């Protein structure tokens, strides 16, 4: 299992300290660790923004556990996911580069609903940072999902080489996703 390197916090954001042993607890049971961190039992209670900053700066967190926790549907998980995305500065990155960077910070869970929430948070953040009338959050969301499907298709050894998606198929599948049905 990969672990985070703790270097992804947006420029100017503050690092959040957590009690000793928090990384180990998170890697064993994210839900229990977050409940502990947000209770204020052994430290100042962390909110969604502080959790997001901790996730982005703390070294040694399990990227698999982080992705699964961020994809959850509790009010705190959704708020922390939005805060996590909100801490990232995609600057002038193209959608594909920003998505690659975003997904390098954790492992995407396998459950479709979790992926949906994560991609929505990514798309909303990218669109907020990049005021582009043609690449709205909805368009970026669909494009991000398409890129994930293309990547899965490309790297899945169970798909025969002659059955892999071609460039033409990818373009055809994404034709009309722009604002007003444009390309």
Residue ranges and their predicted role:
Residues 1-125, 132, 141, 152-183:
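Catalytic and GAP-homology cores of small GTPase regulators
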Residues 130-136:
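A short glycine/serine-rich beta->alpha loop
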């Amino acid at each position: 299992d990969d672990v985070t390197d703790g270097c992804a916090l947006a420029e100017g954001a503050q690092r959040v300290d957590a009690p000793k042993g928090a990384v180990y607890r998170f890697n064993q049971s994210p839900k229990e660790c977050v409940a502990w961190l947000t209770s204020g039992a052994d430290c100042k209670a962390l909110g969604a923004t502080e959790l997001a900053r901790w996730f982005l700066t703390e070294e040694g967190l399990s990227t698999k556990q982080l992705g699964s926790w961020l994809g959850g549907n509790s009010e705190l998980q959704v708020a922390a996911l939005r805060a996590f995305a909100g801490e990232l500065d995609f600057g002038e990155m193209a959608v594909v580069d920003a998505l690659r960077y975003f997904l390098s910070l954790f492992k995407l869970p396998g459950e479709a609903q979790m992926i949906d929430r994560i991609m929505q948070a990514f798309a909303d953040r990218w669109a907020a940072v990049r005021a582009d009338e043609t690449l709205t959050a909805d368009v970026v969301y669909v494009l991000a999902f398409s890129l994930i499907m293309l990547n899965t298709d490309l790297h899945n050894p169970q798909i025969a080489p002659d059955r892999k998606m071609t460039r033409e198929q990818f373009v055809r599948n994404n034709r009309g996703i722009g604002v007003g049905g444009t390309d």
